[in-house]
């Protein structure tokens, strides 16, 4: 059985390491990138089953990455979970609307 593929997009290397270690232990095939530009390229090339996407990143924000993913035919159906320390209702609403 093929492992489910997860694209982990997180610019904080300490957090990324914790997430990846746990996901590896659970048997997932995890690819890590640390900015929005790399995330867009990896989403098309890696074809993950799920993307764990940090909202606040350098170069391209997670919100902008999600918007691009949803408007790109090859990535529109990939499931995405946003990760963020943002706590304002407007931030949650923005992510949900994408």
Q: Which ranges hold each PLM region?
A:
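Two-component/phosphorelay signaling modules centered on CheY-like receiver
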Residues: 13-31
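Hydrophobic residue at a beta-alpha junction
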Residues: 33-34, 57-60, 69
